[in-house]
């Protein structure tokens, strides 16, 4: 007769028969409290999954008897329920040095935008209702006047992101026609969003002109023909061509296109609405400038330099924007009421440009004085050093950050922060990974970056130091 498996005869191991049935587990008084708090459906479902998992462990001989005790089962079930209810999207502390971080939600919403959003969503609102006439309204009205006032355009519409704005513009103005673009502007942005692929998806034929580094007016003139539906300029926001280069400006290109009866569209990508040079930052093209130069359509993002929610903003002539607004695809790409409310409040802030550097988080962080960041680094260094000792050392260091999200890609922002290095050089990589993981595991996760065998915490975006320092005891405990 075969000898029983060790797990069966080992008295320290639990067997599948030791596990209670789901109904029996749920009848316990401690579980009744869970059901009262969270409802029967959720608790019963998690109890079933818990017992299934424990049963697999028991059959494999890997389940200790302590795990099947009533108190242990209640604790495990409570953990499962709370984990299931925990939000997957969480607030974090961005110490990466990238202000508008694509993976960390891009632009921070300003206080007025958050307040307006909460106030409107607490009850019904006039999203598509005309209060004056009592009839059906148009959600574009919420922001169109603001956009035309700020940019000088005749009309405006909005969709849910700038990729959608570009797709919709091409589809509405050049479907089954040709779109002329310089070879040097056939960009790819994050997520494999390639301009040639967008053209194809919009039902237009791409016509490339010029070369990668030099395109002239004559190249556009020669390419325009009876099948041309659109001439397009694409701002290379996430890379830079330098050296022996040439490009045609919007004003000259508008004259060429309009002389042949063809509209000109410009995709600005990041889309700042204020001259960044006034704040000591490199200048980005403005929608206002593009409109004044004669562009029929200008599109740009809402959640980058503009400092608002994710949105694709389209401004231009009444004729061009009218065609875009009435194109069938527009409804599928329209903004929902939440980001539209936040966008309205953000755009209202631009009516008082003198206050933007104080009130708009994105601009406030980009223009934060270096001396202030350096002082913060010096102040935090002792506390962090004590929390990570004796395995790591901490020093205050100068750093170079960046704007992020494809905005001004070659520019760096002088900053300051804390550099954490392992005391033991052997296994330094693993030690830094462990520290980074411990920071991410904090209740309010801290995200830095590893470079040159150190974990760097750029403090430009840390405005409330208390959010960081109050978690240092937890970090210290995690590193023991």
Where in the sequence are the language-model features?
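Conserved PLP-dependent catalytic core of the aminotransferase class-I/II
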Residues: 339-340, 344-404
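Glycine-rich phosphate-binding segment of PLP-dependent enzymes
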Residues: 52, 95-96, 106-132
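Catalytic-core signal marking the mid-to-C-terminal active-site face
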Residues: 12, 383-452
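Long amphipathic alpha-helical segments
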Residues: 2-84
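Short Gly/Ser/Thr- and Asp/Glu-enriched loop/turn motifs at secondary-structure junctions
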Residues: 19-20, 38, 93-97, 306-309, ...
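PLP-dependent enzyme catalytic core of the Aspartate aminotransferase-like
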Residues: 110, 115, 422-480
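Conserved PLP-enzyme active-site core in the AAT-like
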Residues: 134-350, 475
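Long amphipathic N-terminal alpha/beta scaffold segment
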Residues: 63-109, 116
